[in-house]
Amino acid sequence: MSLNTQIPEVLWAQRSNKDDAEKNVIYLTVLIPDAVDPKINLTPEKLVIDSKSGANAHYAVQIDFFKDIDVEKSKYSVTGRYIFFVLYKKELQEEFWPRLTKEKLRLHWLRTDFDRWVDEDEQEAQPEVSPFGAGGMPDLSALGGMGGMDFSQFGNLGGAGAGEDASDSEPELEEEEEVGSNEKKE
């Protein structure tokens, strides 16, 4: 049985920093569901991925990068839905790459990852989050909390007191005879 090769959808975003290599990265998400034994070849100039997906699908893509990346520092993770890469740019620069690929073509399978995208002029103001998942619980200390509330003081508040039932103030309902009962009431 011959498998048709498909090009997977690829999402990308980037950060740039001329002083900190850790903030000079490309985030790349290659959408291959249920990737089976993916073959990944990462060089400074390009990324080549070839993988089966499930029983009937085959995916392959080659991305020739706009500039070189640092292969030694770069890393990836394979999940059940995609392959996620953090690729470190080799050249430290403040400006964003104008595009991911060398070619100035509009590639139908390549899209901006707006979940990870930050505008070039706003990237320093963004909090650092783990690229491999949600950043955990946010810091709520700035919200001020409950203002030192002492819950032990709630016991002295009024309301229905001990032994007093709130339903005592309502009139009693008359008991109704059961209709259709075979038993004789005495």
From Swiss-Prot:
Residue stretches making up the CS domain: 5-101
Domain of life (superkingdom): Eukaryota
Stretches assigned to coiled coil: none
GO-annotated molecular function: Hsp90 protein binding; protein-folding chaperone binding
GO biological process: chaperone-mediated protein complex assembly; protein folding
Annotated signal peptide: none
Gene3D superfamilies in UniProt: 2.60.40.790
Biased composition (Acidic residues): 165-180
Keyword Membrane assigned: no
GO cellular component, one term: nucleus
InterPro entries on file: CS_dom, HSP20-like_chaperone, p23-like
PROSITE patterns in the record: CS (PS51203)
Keywords: Cell cycle
Family matches, as Pfam families: CS
Function: Cell cycle regulatory protein that interacts with cdc2 in the control of the M-G1 transition.
Family indicated by similarity: Belongs to the p23/wos2 family.
Protein name per the record: Protein wos2
